[in-house]
């Protein structure tokens, strides 16, 4: 396995840029800018968070047993754990980057049920313990690129999705894999209130082609930094597809269904001209409202360390995944 490219800059995207983008998205969804201030007065918290103002996180999970295969270890500079678990997009708990850490403690992750169904010979159900015990866990240091043009490097812990799908034995009719987040509005304020949840339709849904899901890079993720995922990172199990934008990494998954037809996906339903089904990281295909040519790496530095670095095609994983898209127009199929 070839090591992935990375440029060593340490910087953080200005919050004013995030607020502007979020307001534009919400306006497109029919939500007034004034509504942003209705449920939360926390918009001013984010800059203070980056300046070192401690904000309590949901409790860290239990330590996990895992291996560290050499193929997935590298010398990329890691994003500190407080930023990995304190700077998140998880609209079910609010729009601000700090909201998930502040609000996700309400999510009950044990007991948990994950069902695999659809075009499979052997449907199956996993419980909470199965997620960390049924498959050997391994740590993988992956780049993570948000569609908002910021990035992290994270030591995720999990198992390849293809191992889970193999147990279910996909039939010849299976062409796609559909994923669904838990729907629990009593625990997730963004599912109760469209202003808190960004006006999205819930539960959150995502999808991959079957060959993407079966790729060895695609990870069912149950931990980070040596411990079980905290709720704000998508506990107890989330998807990581490192060559795609972060919104493809659906969190708190309760359903995986293999299908004949391409499944709907949440952000594509909300704004199809802005968020495609594939969502492959591509510096040559801009978002309609901002460039994807560069990104800001969230590292150990503060907001005064701001510098951009070039975005890499397929987030630096082109050697491993480019063949999946041979002959596909990546501008049309963004």
UniProtKB/Swiss-Prot annotation:
The keyword Amino-acid biosynthesis does not apply. GO terms for molecular function: metal ion binding; molybdopterin cofactor binding; oxidoreductase activity, acting on a sulfur group of donors, quinone or similar compound as acceptor. Residues 1-44 form the signal peptide. The keyword Thylakoid does not apply. Its cofactor is Mo-molybdopterin. Its main location: periplasm. NCBIfam families: PRK05363.1. Heterodimer of a catalytic subunit (MsrP) and a heme-binding subunit (MsrQ). Part of the MsrPQ system that repairs oxidized periplasmic proteins containing methionine sulfoxide residues (Met-O), using respiratory chain electrons. Thus protects these proteins from oxidative-stress damage caused by reactive species of oxygen and chlorine generated by the host defense mechanisms. MsrPQ is essential for the maintenance of envelope integrity under bleach stress, rescuing a wide series of structurally unrelated periplasmic proteins from methionine oxidation, including the primary periplasmic chaperone SurA and the lipoprotein Pal. This is Protein-methionine-sulfoxide reductase catalytic subunit MsrP. It comes from Escherichia coli O9:H4 (strain HS). The gene is msrP.
């Amino acid at each position: 396995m070839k090591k992935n490219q990375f440029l060593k800059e340490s910087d953080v995207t200005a919050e004013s840029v995030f607020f502007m983008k979020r307001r534009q998205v919400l306006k497109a969804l029919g939500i007034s800018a004034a509504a942003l201030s209705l449920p939360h007065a926390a918009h001013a918290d984010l800059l203070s968070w980056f300046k070192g103002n401690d904000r309590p996180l949901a409790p860290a999970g239990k330590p996990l047993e895992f291996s560290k295969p050499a193929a997935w270890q590298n010398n990329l500079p890691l994003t500190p754990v407080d930023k990995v678990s304190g700077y998140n997009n998880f609209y079910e708990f609010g729009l601000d980057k700090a909201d998930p850490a502040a609000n996700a403690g309400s999510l009950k992750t044990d007991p948990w049920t994950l069902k695999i169904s659809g075009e499979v010979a052997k449907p199956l159900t996993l419980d909470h313990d199965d997620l960390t015990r049924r498959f050997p866990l391994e740590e993988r240091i992956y780049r993570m690129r948000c569609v908002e043009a910021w990035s992290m490097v994270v030591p995720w812990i999990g198992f390849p999705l293809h191992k889970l799908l193999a147990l279910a034995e996909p039939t010849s009719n299976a062409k796609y894999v559909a994923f669904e987040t838990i729907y629990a509005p009593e625990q997730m304020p963004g599912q109760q209130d469209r202003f808190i949840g960004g006006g999205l339709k819930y539960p959150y849904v995502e999808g991959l082609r079957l060959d993407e899901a079966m790729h060895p890079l695609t990870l069912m993720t149950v931990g980070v930094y040596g411990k079980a995922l905290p709720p704000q990172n998508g506990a107890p199990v989330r998807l990581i597809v490192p060559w795609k934008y972060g919104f493809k990494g659906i969190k708190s998954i309760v359903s995986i269904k293999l299908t004949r037809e391409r499944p709907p996906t949440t952000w594509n339903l909300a704004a199809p001209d802005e968020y495609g089904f594939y969502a492959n990281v591509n510096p040559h295909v801009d978002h309609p409202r901002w460039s994807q040519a560069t990104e800001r790496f969230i590292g150990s530095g503060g907001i005064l360390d701001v510098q951009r670095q070039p975005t890499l095609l397929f987030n630096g994983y082109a050697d491993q995944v480019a063949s999946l898209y041979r002959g596909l127009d990546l501008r049309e199929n963004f």
